[in-house]
C-alpha cells in the first residue's frame, strides 16, 4: 500500500497529490528536495527518510518531479513501473498546460488525475500478483559490470606480456606431454621423423617453433653460460668501506642527554624554543587570514596564454566549418546519446582519484538530470554533459552546513565557556601537525589555546605536541599579548583514559579562561573496535563543539571506507540518544597530489560534511580554505 504519490514542478508548485496511509507528505518530500535534488545526488532513484522509502523520477523536458512514498519494510516490486506509467500518462494528458511553463498557467490548471491514477495503481497491483518466471541477471546488469575497466587499474608484479608468454609456455608443455613428443627433452619435429603438418597430427604454430629453437639453443650453450655467471660472481669485490652518514640541516643529534624525555614535566607554559627553528617552521604569509586554495599550475597558465593568442593557420573557411560542426539544433538528450561521453567522464574521474562507486553515482546523477532536456542551438553533447558535471561537483563541495570557527568561538566567549574541538582519524595522516597549524591560526586571530594531549597510546605523541606548543609559544610570547600566556599544553602522560584527560583539560580551560581547547586523539584504524569505542566515549562524555576528521588527499576508495566506518562506529558505540558524528573534514597533504584532487569529492559526497581546512605544506602558514571552483577546475583538467 502506498503512503502518498505527488507530482510537482521544479519551481515548487504541487500539481497533484494522492494521500494514502500517510497523513502528510510535506516532511519526506522536503527532505528529498534538501538532501538529494538540491545536493545533486540523483545517482540513485530512491531515498530513505525515517520509516519511509521514497522513489522519484525527473522529467527534465517539462521540469517535473514524480515522487512516491511507501513503508521501507515493504517490498513493492511494481513501484518503478507505476512511476513510469504515471509519468507517461500525466505528460500526455496535460501536455498543453505543462508546455506553457508559467506559474500562473500551472496554478490555474485543473489536474484531475485521481481516477487515472487509481486505475494504474490497480493494474500494477494485479500484475505484480502474477509473478513471471525469474531469470538470471546478466553480467551487464550487475554492479560489477558498472565498475571501471581493468585498464584503469595499475597492478604491480609481472607484465601482461610476460603472463601471456608464461601461459603459452604452460599450454605448450601440456600439449607436448599429451602428444607423441612426451619425452624427457623437447625434440623438434624434424628430428622426430614426423613432418610438422596436420596430416600427422602435429600442427606447430610460429610461437611453438620459436620456443623449440630456443630450447635447443639453451641445451647446447646453457652449461657455458652457467660457468661464466659463476665466475663473474666470484670476481666481484667482497665489501666496500661504509659510507659516511649524511648530516641533515634539521636532523638533530644522537646525544643521550638530548634524547632523554623521561624527566618529569608539569602542565603550564612551555620553555622557549631556539629562534632558528621558529623562523623555519613559521613559513611565509599571513597567518591570521585563511587564503583560498589555488590548484592552478604553470602548465595551466601556458595553455591559457597559447589559447588567447590568435592562430594564423586557421582561415575563415576553418572557422565556418567549426561553427557548422557545433551546430546541433534543438535536440532532446537521451541516454544513448550520453552513454559514450559519460563513460569517458567516469574513467576520467577515477583517474583523478575519485572513488569508483562515487564516480558511477555522479555520472548516473548527471544522466538523470539531463535525460529529456532540450539542448541549446550551438551546444554539443560533450559540452552539455561536462557543464552539468561541473555544476554537480561544485554543488557537492558546497554542502548544507558551513563551519565558521571564529564566529562560533566568539559565541562561546559570550557564554563564558571554552570552544572544544576534537581531532580524529587514522594513523599517520597529520592530526598533530594540522592541530598545530590551526592553533597558530587561532593565535594570530587573538584567541588563547589549550592543547590537550589525549593520545596516550602512541610513543612520543606527548613530546610531539609539546614541541609544537613550545614553538607556538615562542611565536606568540606573553609579552606580545600584554601578559597572559596564549598557548599551553595539558597532559597526563601515557596509559591514562583519554576521555578523563579531555574532561580535566576542559575544566582547566574554563577555570583559567582559555578560549579554545584542541583535543589531540590517538590515530586508529577504522576496524579497531576497542579504540573506536574509546573515541566514541571521549566524544559522548565531553560533547565537543566540533568533531573534525583528518584525512589524506592521497587516498581514493580508502577515504570512503574510513569515513563510513568512523561514522558507523561513533553511532554504534555511543551511549547518547542522538549519537554525535563527524562535523567536518581536514584534508591534509594536498601539496603532494598535483591535480588528482578526487579525495575531496569522495569525502564530501559520502558524508555531506564540509571540508573546513586544507593542509598544503609543513609550516604553520600552510593552511588553506577550500575553493570549490578551483578544485573542480583541477578535477576536470585533462
From Swiss-Prot:
Alphabetically ordered keywords of this record: Endoplasmic reticulum, GTP-binding, Membrane, Nucleotide-binding, Phosphoprotein, Receptor
Ranges where the record places region Disordered: 129-205, 218-245, 262-315
Bias (Basic and acidic residues) ranges: 137-146, 153-165, 218-239
GO CC, one annotated term: signal recognition particle receptor complex
Compositionally biased residues, Polar residues: 304-314
GO biological process: intracellular protein transport; protein targeting to ER; SRP-dependent cotranslational protein targeting to membrane
A single GO molecular function term of this UniProt record: GTP binding
Binding site for GTP: 425-432, 520-524, 588-591
InterPro entries for this protein: AAA+_ATPase (IPR003593), Longin-like_dom_sf (IPR011012), P-loop_NTPase (IPR027417), Sig_recog_particle_rcpt_asu_N (IPR007222), Signal_recog_particl_SRP54_hlx (IPR013822), SRP/SRP_N (IPR036225), SRP54_GTPase_dom (IPR000897), SRP54_N_sf (IPR042101)
Domain of life where this protein originates: Eukaryota
Region NG domain: start-end pairs: 419-636
PTM annotation (Phosphoserine): residues: 177, 296-298, 473
Pfam families: SRP-alpha_N (PF04086), SRP54 (PF00448), SRP54_N (PF02881)
Membrane topology: Peripheral membrane protein
Modified residues (Phosphothreonine): 284, 578
Compartments where located: Endoplasmic reticulum membrane
Classification via SUPFAM superfamilies: Domain of the SRP/SRP receptor G-proteins (SSF47364), P-loop containing nucleoside triphosphate hydrolases (SSF52540), SNARE-like (SSF64356)
PANTHER family reported for this sequence: SIGNAL RECOGNITION PARTICLE RECEPTOR SUBUNIT ALPHA
Similarity-based family: Belongs to the GTP-binding SRP family.
Function per UniProt: Component of the SRP (signal recognition particle) receptor. Ensures, in conjunction with the signal recognition particle, the correct targeting of the nascent secretory proteins to the endoplasmic reticulum membrane system. Forms a guanosine 5'-triphosphate (GTP)-dependent complex with the SRP subunit SRP54. SRP receptor compaction and GTPase rearrangement drive SRP-mediated cotranslational protein translocation into the ER.
Complexes and interactors: Heterodimer with SRPRB. Interacts with the signal recognition particle (SRP) complex subunit SRP54.
Domain notes: The NG domain, also named G domain, is a special guanosine triphosphatase (GTPase) domain, which forms a guanosine 5'-triphosphate (GTP)-dependent complex with a homologous NG domain in the signal recognition particle (SRP) complex subunit SRP54. The two NG domains undergo cooperative rearrangements upon their assembly, which culminate in the reciprocal activation of the GTPase activity of one another. GTPase induced rearrangement of SR drives SRP-mediated cotranslational protein translocation into the ER.
Protein name: Signal recognition particle receptor subunit alpha
Naturally occurring in which organism (per UniProt): Canis lupus familiaris
Amino acid at each position: 500500500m502506498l503512503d502518498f504519490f505527488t507530482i510537482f514542478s521544479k519551481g515548487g508548485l504541487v500539481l497533484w497529490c494522492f494521500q494514502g496511509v500517510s497523513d502528510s507528505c510535506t516532511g519526506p518530500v522536503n527532505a528529498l528536495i534538501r538532501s538529494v535534488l538540491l545536493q545533486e545526488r540523483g545517482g540513485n532513484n530512491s531515498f530513505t527518510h525515517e520509516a519511509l522509502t521514497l522513489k522519484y523520477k525527473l522529467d527534465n523536458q517539462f521540469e517535473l518531479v514524480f515522487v512516491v512514498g511507501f513503508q521501507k519494510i515493504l517490498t513493492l516490486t511494481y513501484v518503478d513501473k507505476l512511476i513510469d506509467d504515471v509519468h507517461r500518462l500525466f505528460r500526455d494528458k496535460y501536455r498543453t498546460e505543462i508546455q506553457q511553463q508559467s506559474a500562473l498557467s500551472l496554478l490555474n490548471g485543473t489536474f484531475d488525475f485521481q481516477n487515472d491514477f487509481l486505475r494504474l495503481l490497480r493494474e500494477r497491483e494485479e500484475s505484480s500478483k502474477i509473478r513471471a518466471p525469474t531469470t538470471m541477471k546478466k553480467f551487464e546488469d550487475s554492479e560489477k559490470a558498472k565498475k571501471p575497466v581493468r585498464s584503469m587499474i595499475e597492478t604491480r608484479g609481472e607484465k601482461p606480456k610476460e603472463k601471456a608468454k608464461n601461459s603459452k609456455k604452460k599450454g605448450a608443455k601440456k600439449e607436448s606431454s599429451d602428444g607423441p613428443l612426451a619425452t624427457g627433452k623437447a625434440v623438434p619435429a624434424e628430428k622426430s621423423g614426423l613432418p610438422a603438418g596436420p596430416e600427422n597430427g602435429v600442427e606447430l604454430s610460429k610461437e611453438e617453433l620459436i620456443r623449440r629453437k630456443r630450447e635447443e639453443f639453451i641445451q647446447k650453450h646453457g652449461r657455458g653460460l652457467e660457468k661464466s655467471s659463476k665466475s663473474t660472481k666470484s670476481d666481484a669485490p667482497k665489501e666496500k668501506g661504509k659510507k659516511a652518514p649524511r648530516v641533515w640541516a634539521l636532523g638533530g643529534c644522537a646525544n643521550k642527554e638530548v634524547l632523554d624525555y623521561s624527566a618529569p614535566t608539569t602542565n603550564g607554559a612551555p620553555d622557549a624554543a631556539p629562534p632558528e627553528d621558529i623562523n623555519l617552521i613559521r613559513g611565509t604569509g599571513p597567518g591570521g587570514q585563511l587564503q583560498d586554495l589555488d590548484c592552478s599550475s604553470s602548465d595551466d597558465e601556458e595553455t591559457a596564454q597559447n589559447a588567447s593568442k590568435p592562430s594564423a593557420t586557421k582561415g575563415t573557411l576553418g572557422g565556418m566549418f567549426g561553427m557548422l560542426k557545433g551546430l546541433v539544433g534543438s535536440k532532446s538528450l537521451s541516454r544513448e546519446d550520453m552513454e559514450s561521453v559519460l563513460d569517458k567522464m567516469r574513467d576520467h574521474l577515477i583517474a583523478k582519484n575519485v572513488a569508483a562507486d562515487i564516480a558511477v553515482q555522479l555520472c548516473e546523477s548527471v544522466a538523470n538530470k539531463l535525460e529529456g532536456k532540450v539542448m541549446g542551438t550551438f551546444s554539443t553533447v560533450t559540452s552539455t554533459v561536462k557543464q552539468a558535471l561541473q555544476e554537480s561537483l561544485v554543488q557537492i563541495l558546497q554542502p548544507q552546513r558551513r563551519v565558521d570557527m571564529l564566529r562560533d568561538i566568539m559565541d562561546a566567549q559570550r557564554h563564558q565557556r571554552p570552544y572544544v574541538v576534537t581531532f580524529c582519524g587514522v594513523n599517520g595522516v597529520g592530526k598533530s601537525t594540522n592541530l598545530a597549524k590551526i592553533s597558530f591560526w587561532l593565535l594570530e586571530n587573538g584567541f588563547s589555546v589549550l592543547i590537550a594531549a589525549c593520545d596516550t597510546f602512541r610513543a612520543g605523541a606527548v613530546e610531539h605536541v609539546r614541541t609544537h606548543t613550545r614553538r607556538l609559544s615562542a611565536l606568540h610570547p606573553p609579552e606580545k599579548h600584554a601578559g597572559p600566556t596564549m598557548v599551553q599544553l595539558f597532559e597526563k602522560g601515557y596509559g591514562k583514559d583519554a576521555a578523563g584527560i579531555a574532561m580535566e583539560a576542559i575544566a582547566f580551560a574554563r577555570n583559567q579562561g582559555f578560549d579554545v581547547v584542541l583535543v589531540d586523539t590517538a590515530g586508529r584504524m577504522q576496524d579497531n573496535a576497542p579504540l573506536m569505542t574509546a573515541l566514541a566515549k571521549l566524544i559522548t562524555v565531553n560533547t565537543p563543539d566540533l568533531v573534525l576528521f583528518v584525512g589524506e588527499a592521497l587516498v581514493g576508495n580508502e577515504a570512503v571506507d574510513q569515513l563510513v566506518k568512523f561514522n558507523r562506529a561513533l553511532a554504534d558505540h555511543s551511549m547518547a540518544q542522538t549519537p554525535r558524528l563527524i562535523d567536518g573534514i581536514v584534508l591534509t597533504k594536498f601539496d603532494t597530489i598535483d591535480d588528482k584532487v578526487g579525495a575531496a569529492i569522495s569525502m564530501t559526497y559520502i558524508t555531506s560534511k564540509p571540508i573546513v581546512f586544507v593542509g598544503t605544506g609543513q609550516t604553520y602558514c600552510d593552511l588553506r580554505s577550500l575553493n570549490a571552483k578551483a578544485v573542480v577546475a583541477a578535477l576536470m583538467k585533462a
